Amino acid sequence: MSVSHPAHLTVLDVQDVGPHLRRLVLGDGDVARGFDALAARWSGWADSYVKLVFLADGVTYPDPLDLDEVRASLPSDVWPVLRTYTVRRLDLEARELWVDVVLHGDEGVAGPWAAQVRPGATIHVRGPGGAYAPDPAADHHLLVGDESALPAIAATLETLPAGARATVFCEVDGPDDELDVHTVADVDLRWLHRGEAAAGTTTLLDDAVRAWSWPEGRVQAFVHGESRLLKTVRPYVRERVARGDLSVSAYWRLGATEEGFRRWKAEQRAVEPG
């Protein structure tokens, strides 16, 4: 199945894994049974992502859904809205896709939907894509991010072998937002609490990384979260990590919709290639 044909999946379970984080367990149901199509594209990247596809009410779309056909035949104001989320886990044996959604009240499209969705609902899912996996040969792994990067950070820690060393800086609202992460690696996990400050407005991650005692040997770094990380943490880490050992990207931008965020990323690529 081509990428223009998203997989049609069923919400199997909904779990609140934190006060602001809801896990959607997706798979095959009675009506939507697209897991095999999704799994066929799976490459196992730790930062694998999918796009949840939200259809406009009252519009007749091609069945099966073909996004290329939609864009060619329907006006742009009824094109589906796509929202990107990192895959927390894809379990081929259990035939489940886990997607963790940060809840922001009534803001946006995906958050309000995730806040009220119940098992049995269906959703189209495009992807997965991805590009990062931890190299077991690295001497140390540095993982930096906020809630949006937490699924990828957790997936990375789960794949690290015994004896691997990692340091994690993760910014969340407070202690209740800290998650249990299972790993056999030697991990120093440091939670940074922003308190009443809004996400994307603090210097907690930048300050923590700059105060960190850089270890000897080869360091592989993963730096993802709100766009300010590109201007603060990225330059500092780039001076210390080989280009091929650095995965750095913004997952979101304060005050921007995903459409606006995509435009901003395109502008950044134009002025700073690579």
Describe the role of every protein-language-model region.
Residues M1-G274:
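Extended, composition-driven regions rather than compact fold-specific motifs
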